[in-house]
């Protein structure tokens, strides 16, 4: 079966980045199309799936069940808001900023540097965050930093 990479972390669902990617990974994994090496679930609390479900006050397994029942990303996010919590606009802005910068001058920097080298991108100065690395690994050009 042919594999497919998930959408970029930057895809927004009701202003929230990463959520669409998490749902994409859930759907691709269930269909047997998620390439090997992608992290899904909440076993490691530092991975983005775990952080996102905690941010929304959700149980990951319940989110998987709901996602596989079908519906748009927006419909599933509304279900999340009703089931867990609805972050304020300010909280979403803080979440988005955290993810956009993760790996840049923080406790995840060392692991990011190691992962860059393993992926063959050790010499790439344009890869400064985990989102940059995901984009590069999936054939997208990392985005220049912006404050928005």
Where do the language-model regions lie?
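Polar/charged low-complexity regulatory segments
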Residues: 2-41, 98-148
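Generic, low-specificity signal for short hydrophobic/alpha-helical stretches with a mild N-terminal bias
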Residues: 1-8, 45-46, 77, 81, ...
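Amphipathic protein-protein interaction modules
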Residues: 63-120
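Amphipathic alpha-helical packing elements
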Residues: 35-81
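Alpha-helix initiation and N-capping motif
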Residues: 16-19, 60, 73-74, 92, ...
